UniProtKB/Swiss-Prot annotation:
This protein's GO CC annotations: ribonucleoprotein complex; ribosome
SMART domains registered for this protein in UniProt: Ribosomal_S10 (SM01403)
The name this protein goes by in its record: Small ribosomal subunit protein uS10
Assembly and interaction partners: Part of the 30S ribosomal subunit.
Keyword hit for Ribonucleoprotein: yes
Gene: rpsJ
Species of origin: Rickettsia massiliae (strain Mtu5)
Amino acid sequence: MKNKIKIRLKSFDHRSLDQATKEIVSAVKRTFANINGPIPLPRKIGRFTVNRSPHVHKKSREQFEIRKHKRLLVIGDPNPAVVDALSKVDLAAGVDVVIELESGE
């Protein structure tokens, strides 16, 4: 039976995302577990166009964009020490973490 832990990290700021990824990787490597990643996933770019003026001047517009950066970490055959190390990692406030446990036969 082969278990895996998949960790998906999302953030609007790539610097805080890379810092969080380094912290998780170093915590897992201290437990001597097998880790694959960080795998950079495609970023999503949302673009918004709004009028600058509230009334007239339709041709005068402003464009904004928001970028969502993502990384994937896969821990193969984790042990209880890995789970304990992951629970003790303190990450930045702007990083969203999704942890999935996948068990295979």
